[in-house]
Each structure stands twice: as C-alpha cells, then as structure tokens.
C-alpha cells in the first residue's frame, strides 16, 4: 500500500505550498543519490519527488485529498471514459494545455522559478500609550525576520563546495512530460521536482541556513510614530520584511498600532473628552477653573483655563477649541477638547451655610418645611443626614 504523501514529506494536510516546498527541499537534499549513498536512499528520493509533484500542484493535490492515489491514476475519471486526461489535471488544464501548445510549438508553458523572488511581508503589533498616539514619537522594536545568510551569502551552499547543475532538468528548472490526448501527443512543462525550479542543486548545504540561503535573525528597529495615529493605524516600513531569494528585493514590515486607554481622557477621532468637577456655587454663579489637557499632561504647557458660565447645568459640555488630537498627516490642524461639567452637591454643610441657604430659599419663596423645589430638596437631603440632625438637636 502506497504511503501517504503528506506523511512522506512530514507535513500536515493543511500545510501551505511554501511549507510543503521547504519540507521537500530539505528531504531532497538529504536523500539525493549524489549525497546519500545508503541503501534505499534512491528509492526514498523518488518517493519524495513523487509526493512533491502531487502536493505542489493545486489540481493534483485537490484530487489526491479527495480520492487518494486512485484520483491520480485516472480511477476518479474512469466512469467518464477519460482515463488519459488524469495526467494533465482535468478539462480546464486540458484545453489550456491544448491552446498553449498550439500557439507555442507543442510545449505547455510553466513559469520557471529561477528568477529573483521578493521576500515576504511581515506584521508587527505595537502597543502605544494614549499620549504617544496623540503626539507621536519614536519607538524601538525588536523583530525576527529572514536575512541573507552571512555564511553562504545566499547561495545555500556550504563554503568551499559547489552548486551543480540539476541532474534532473539539466539546469532548465523545468521538466517535460509527454501526454497522450484525443488531440494527439503533447508535452507538458512543469517545475523540476528536484531543484524546485532553481536549475541548480547543492553539493553540500550550508550548515548555517540548511541550504535555504536565508537565515533567521533578530534585530532592532526604530519606528517613527506620526502624531494623530489611532488603534488600527497601519505603518509600512519599506524593505524591513524578509529578505528576497536569488537576489530578489526584501518584503516590507507592516506595523499595526493599538492604543491603550487613559484614565483621564477619552478619544473619538480628533476629539478629546473629559470631565471637570465644579461646586454647585460655581455652577450657579459662574467661575474660571484650570483643567488638564492632553498638552498639559504631556508636559507641553500649563493647564488650560476654562470659563464656567453662570447658571451652568449638570452635564453641560464646554469646548476648548484646538486642544484635541492633531490630524494625521497635518498635525497643525487639531480637533477640540470637549469637557462635561459634573456639579458636586455637598453631603455636609455647616450651620452657617445651612442658614444662608435657608434665607436664599425664603427669598425664592421655597417652603422649607415641605422641602419643595431644588434648594428645598437640597436642604431636605442635607437636614436628613445624621450629622446635620445632630446639629439641629444641639
């Protein structure tokens, strides 16, 4: 019974094509007949090549996952009488192959992997304090990524050893396979399973990168945080992703920002929200009070002066214009700072204060005994407190 192709390569069934390729290249180097002279190594090498040939092809892999080995031998298509079509991936591949062959002289086209390959992009999640997001700054981060191997210089070969022409494809990076169809005999070109399209094989892999040409390394980066960023903002750092292969350009680093909350301020876009507590007398008579702003908390300026209009009600919202968040990309433009008044009613008052309030209530025609009206209700609450009842009894 044939072994499972995923088991042969040592990968799971949900592995990506890149993971399958890495597993194949690692095993191919280990069991290549030019390197491994042990009995059975050649058979193992052929088994590895067959597994990679199937799992690296999306169509073949899908049929293998569904039907197993039978799906590759034509059994899955036998009911339709088209056993010969199984080798070229179904009707879609058949007609694509036919028209490509017609236009290209009888050779199906498959893109070679010998050229430069751009490195992968990377993601890094970065937490910012509330004020860092508002005013920006510089942050130092540490990332792990792939760089060109310093030992082999990216060739993948152990220093002092050669990179040889692939014996399977002769350096072309592609192999041809003749296929018989109802339209005649055609040749299909696919990526060489031995060299993975590189056209070259290693005499001996580099001990530092295991023949990949790239090595995992950690480095520090300084990231410039512009003023006005928020949670979800994405910053691109060009060229700081994984290194490219075969001289390809590196990928980019994408930094995703997450802003931590602040105990004093809330934010919605460019607007800052906070509260200020004032006494009931300040709310009634009006006042000027100092309030903290994001600028003062950051140490950029003193607290701002806020004018409380006379007769302000609890929940009144006052605005400090231009004291909000700088606009991202144009920090000279800023939002506003909205401040909600929280009017504090004292829980204890002195006898003198109570007497003054009672006189004020009488001026307004309040019936103190019944504790009607706003001030009456205030006095009733004050009078019912244990401490105030004791004062009355004295």
Swiss-Prot record:
Residue sites binding Zn(2+) 1 per the record: 149, 152, 206, 209
GO cellular component: cytoplasm
Every J domain range: 4-68
The UniProt record lists the keyword Translocase: no
Keyword Cytoplasm: yes
GO BP terms, alphabetized: chaperone cofactor-dependent protein refolding; DNA replication; protein refolding; response to heat
CXXCXGXG motif repeats: 149-156, 166-173, 192-199, 206-213
Cofactor note: Binds 2 Zn(2+) ions per monomer.
InterPro entries, per database record: DnaJ (IPR012724), DnaJ_C (IPR002939), DnaJ_domain (IPR001623), DnaJ_domain_CS (IPR018253), HSP40/DnaJ_pept-bd (IPR008971), HSP_DnaJ_Cys-rich_dom (IPR001305), HSP_DnaJ_Cys-rich_dom_sf (IPR036410), J_dom_sf (IPR036869)
Cofactor needs: Zn(2+)
Ranges in a coiled coil: none
Record's subcellular location: Cytoplasm
HAMAP family given in the database record: DnaJ
Domain comment, as recorded: The J domain is necessary and sufficient to stimulate DnaK ATPase activity. Zinc center 1 plays an important role in the autonomous, DnaK-independent chaperone activity of DnaJ. Zinc center 2 is essential for interaction with DnaK and for DnaJ activity.
NCBIfam families: DnaJ_bact, PRK10767.1, PRK14293.1
Protein's name according to its UniProt entry: Chaperone protein DnaJ
Species of the source: Synechococcus sp. (strain JA-3-3Ab)
């Amino acid at each position: 019974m044939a072994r499972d192709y995923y088991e042969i390569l040592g990968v799971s069934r949900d592995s990506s094509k890149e993971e399958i390729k890495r597993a194949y290249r690692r095993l191919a180097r280990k069991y290549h007949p030019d390197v491994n002279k042990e009995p059975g190594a050649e058979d193992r090498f052929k088994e590895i090549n067959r597994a990679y040939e199937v799992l690296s092809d999306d169509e073949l892999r899908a049929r293998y996952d569904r039907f197993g080995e039978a799906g590759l031998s034509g059994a899955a298509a036998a009911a339709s009488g088209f056993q010969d079509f199984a080798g070229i991936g179904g009707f879609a591949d058949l007609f694509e192959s036919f028209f490509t062959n017609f236009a290209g002289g009888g050779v199906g086209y498959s893109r070679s992997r010998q050229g430069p390959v751009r490195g992968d992009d990377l993601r890094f999640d970065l937490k910012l304090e509330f004020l860092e997001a508002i005013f920006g700054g510089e942050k130092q981060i540490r990332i792990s990524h792939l760089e060109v191997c310093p030992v082999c210089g990216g060739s993948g070969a152990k220093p002092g050893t050669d990179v040889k022409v692939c014996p399977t494809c002769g350096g072309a990076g592609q192999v041809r396979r003749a296929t018989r169809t109802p339209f005649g005999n055609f040749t299909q070109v696919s990526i060489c399973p031995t060299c993975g399209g590189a056209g070259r094989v290693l005499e001996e892999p580099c001990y530092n990168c295991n023949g990949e040409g790239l090595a995992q390394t950690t480095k520090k980066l300084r990231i410039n945080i512009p003023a006005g960023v928020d949670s979800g903002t994405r910053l691109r750092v060009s060229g700081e992703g994984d290194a490219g292969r075969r001289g390809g350009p590196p990928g980019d680093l994408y930094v995703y920002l997450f802003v931590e909350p602040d105990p004093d301020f809330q934010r919605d876009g460019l607007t800052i929200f906070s509260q200020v507590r004032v006494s009931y007398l300040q709310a009634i008579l009006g006042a000027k009070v100092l309030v903290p702003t994001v600028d003062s908390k950051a140490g950029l300026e003193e607290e701002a002066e806020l004018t409380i209009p006379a007769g302000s009600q609890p929940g009144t919202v006052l605005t400090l214009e231009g004291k909000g968040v700088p606009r991202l990309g144009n920090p000279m433009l800023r939002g506003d700072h909205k401040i909600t008044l929280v009017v504090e009613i004292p829980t204890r008052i002195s006898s003198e204060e109570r007497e003054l309030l009672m006189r004020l209530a009488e001026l307004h025609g309040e019936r103190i005994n019944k504790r009607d009206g706003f001030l009456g209700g205030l006095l009733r609450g004050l009078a019912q407190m244990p401490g105030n009842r004791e004062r009355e009894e004295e």
